[in-house]
Amino acid sequence: MDLFSEESPINEIGNMDMTDQQTQLCSSSFSHFLKHPKVQHFISTYSELVKMPTIRYVYFYYLFKKIGGFIGNEKIGTYFSKNVCNNIAAKGVPKLADVYKACEKMNLRQQSEICLLIEEVTRGQYLNSLWDALRDGTISSSKFYWATKKQNSTKKIFEPWPIKNDYYVAGPLAFGLRCEEVIKTVLNELICTPKQASCFDCGFMQSPLDGIFGVSLDYCTNVETNKDNLLVFHPDTEVYEIKSRFKYLFDKSECDTLYKKYKELYSNPCVKTLIKFIFSVSKPAIEFVPSGRLPSESDYLLAYDEEWNLRPTKKRKLNASHEMIKKCIEYNSYAGSQIYILSDPAENNGQITVKSKFKAGIFMNPRHTYFYQVALQHRVVQSYIGLSESPKSLGTQKNFIVSSFFRKRHFSDPPVCYVGKKQLEKTVEIPVFIIITPVYIPRSALLETISQAVNFWEESAKEAFTEYPWAPCALFANGDLTP
């Protein structure tokens, strides 16, 4: 499908089946746009350096003017016509130079509003037909870690990663997708009830400031939806990244070692019984690391307290080359995590509630890829907060990672179970407890990793395209997370 053709998508792909139509939409990516002969010619001949994020908004203009009617959402194309390209002739396909000049004059508010419209149109994430196309050419939270480490090949940035939803039903990926929805309900119904409006289904959030980064959020609070169905991020937005621990899934059977340890935790909820449960698998989800020592990258939760030192291993000392890691540990190590033990529906008339809660000295591992994932979410959400129409002026964004643990269904479970007032689907496992860990990102560490990732993005662009857009360091040099 040619974004520069006047041919209607209905004529181009309307007669295809749904799968082929989705393939065509996915192929309308930023990479394919940049490779188009018209775009390559424009970049090579334009009187100035073609730069980010302007060229990304040019891409959005041509994409949504082309497909808006076909996908049943013309809001983005209409916004461009009324607010950005209002001096460009309505008939025909406008010249690249004219659209680029118009997009170059956009202010931060307009950029933010376009990104919010894109978030709306991409809700549904991996089930959304535009998801792969719009993730292409961006460093998403799942790519941020290896982008800072300059790992993997350029195709990971500039070719779509098709998200296949035909995962093996008993495998960890399908398990994670199922359980994510359950934990959103647990958070919404049992944990975050005093908070303001929550967002369950967040689309793709392109960073409005640079056009290079993008994230999607599992669950957040203190975020509202306005009359136009667009998200409004308040200064005290809380973002929750959900991880479901497949290796701890157990049967409600005396033959299952995990179940025996869980029973101890359930009857006597405390740090001691939690440690016994966590260490009942060969590779525990929480790593003990003594003060002043370097953690491994094997898992994303750490503990300082000696009671976690059940399997002593030698650790390297933190040295001058680990300054960023040291600072991140200092920011996180004393925060602690909140553990919520959930009631067994078989003992509680089908109701899953918070049976008990306690605090433990568990914190985020700054060497793990999930720390980078949360860091980028923080950065992008902060830019939306800064550009938000929120009536609030006070508050600070908070970020959390939620570790969730489940058991398999048992014949003793009631046929219908509830989390708060919400019915639990009969096909999902039973949640037994969650660990909520706050994540703090030092500003200096965030700026350093952002700079590294941008450099990698530009290197990747040089390798992927003959003519490529420029990523000005002015976008990042001052470290402004809000305009």
Swiss-Prot record:
Keywords, ordered alphabetically: Endonuclease, Exonuclease, Host cytoplasm, Host nucleus, Host-virus interaction, Hydrolase, Nuclease
Annotated GO CC locations: host cell cytoplasm; host cell nucleus
EC number: 3.1.-.-
Record's subcellular location: Host nucleus; Host cytoplasm
Major localization class: host cell
SUPFAM superfamilies with a match to the protein in the record: Restriction endonuclease-like
Broad class of enzyme this protein falls into: hydrolase
Family (UniProt): Belongs to the herpesviridae alkaline nuclease family.
Quaternary data: Forms a complex with the DNA polymerase, the DNA polymerase processivity factor, and the major DNA binding protein.
Protein name: Shutoff alkaline exonuclease
Protein's organism: Saimiriine herpesvirus 2 (strain 11) (SaHV-2)
